[in-house]
């Protein structure tokens, strides 16, 4: 049997596909890589906020819907909380480091005033501005190799990216991991997800064998919290869950100009849906109490 895997053509995306392929090859399944060019790849000078939601996923998923591929592989943080009704999550791999990192010669609080810091994430920009409003924050697009090249050329004094990308690429660079209480990661950061057609039970059954159930429960909790908050808050949210046996620990945070709201909770004997929903509702209640939303 051969499974066709659709993904973007970047080096990082290709490595993520290879990680999935390694699991399939151990099961005796052959694979074929289907490269998809997305709008995000074609317009790398445009800020992500201008390209719209789902910019990394829609065209890749469409290849699955059009039967040009059997499954799509993504970084799960790029997947909208609601995907096509004809698609579903088949599997996730064990989570890689979920944190944000600052690649720089100095840590965040030792950077000189007016240091140039690169990021294309509004969430990261908002956290940066809250802690260090004396920094010069500039957009930074392109694949990880491009971003690192710009940093080493001296165009930036530091750049903020996901630790998982450095981990997967095996890049040897000096960096500082950002505490999730201060820089709460994007929901599902560090998780590789496989998406397929709902009615394709044969392929779905294969991926059920490689699915990491604990990581999936964490992903569900984070996505549920994000979906609860999403309709009531226009500022990008960080959501991070950990699982200990049957218990969950969750952090949800966002920065609103000079004010930053963070909620941290422990949840006992709850499903991931229940834990995520409760954390999201408590965050909404807090930002209402603070007058951030009506």
UniProtKB/Swiss-Prot annotation:
Pathway assignment: Porphyrin-containing compound metabolism; protoporphyrin-IX biosynthesis; coproporphyrinogen-III from 5-aminolevulinate: step 2/4
Keyword Transferase tagged: yes
Other facts noted in the record for this chain: The porphobilinogen subunits are added to the dipyrromethane group.
Positions carrying S-(dipyrrolylmethanemethyl)cysteine: 233
GO molecular function list: hydroxymethylbilane synthase activity
Protein name: Probable porphobilinogen deaminase
Catalytic activity, as annotated: 4 porphobilinogen + H2O = hydroxymethylbilane + 4 NH4(+)
Keyword field: Porphyrin biosynthesis, Transferase
Protein task: Tetrapolymerization of the monopyrrole PBG into the hydroxymethylbilane pre-uroporphyrinogen in several discrete steps.
Family: Belongs to the HMBS family.
Obligatory cofactor(s): dipyrromethane
Comment on bound cofactor: Binds 1 dipyrromethane group covalently.
């Amino acid at each position: 049997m051969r499974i066709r895997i659709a993904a973007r053509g970047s080096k990082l995306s290709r490595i993520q596909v290879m990680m999935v392929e390694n699991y399939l090859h151990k099961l005796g399944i052959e694979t074929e890589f289907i490269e998809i060019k997305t709008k995000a790849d074609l317009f790398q000078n445009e800020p992500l906020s201008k390209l719209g939601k789902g910019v990394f996923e829609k065209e890749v998923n469409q290849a699955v819907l059009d039967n040009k591929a059997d499954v799509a592989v993504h970084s799960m943080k790029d997947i909208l909380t609601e995907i096509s009704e004809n698609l579903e999550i088949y599997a996730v791999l064990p989570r890689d480091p979920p944190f944000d990192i600052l690649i720089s010669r100095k840590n965040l609080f030792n950077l000189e005033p007016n240091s140039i810091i690169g990021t294309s994430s509004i969430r990261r920009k908002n956290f940066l501005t809250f802690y260090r409003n004396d920094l010069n924050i500039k957009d930074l697009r392109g694949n990880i190799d491009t971003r690192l090249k710009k940093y080493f050329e001296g165009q930036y004094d530091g750049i903020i990216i996901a630790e998982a990308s450095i981990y997967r690429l095996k890049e040897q660079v000096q960096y500082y991991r950002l505490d999730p209480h201060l820089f709460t990661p994007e929901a599902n950061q560090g998780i590789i997800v496989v998406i397929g057609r709902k009615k394709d039970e044969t392929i779905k059954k294969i991926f059920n064998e490689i699915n990491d159930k604990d990581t999936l429960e964490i992903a569900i909790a984070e996505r549920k919290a994000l979906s609860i908050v999403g309709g009531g808050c226009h500022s990008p949210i960080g959501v991070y869950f950990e699982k200990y046996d049957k218990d969950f620990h969750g952090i949800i945070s966002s920065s609103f100009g000079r004010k930053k709201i963070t909620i941290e909770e422990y949840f006992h004997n709850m499903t991931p849906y229940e834990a995520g929903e409760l954390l999201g509702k408590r965050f909404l209640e807090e930002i209402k109490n603070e007058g951030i939303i009506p």
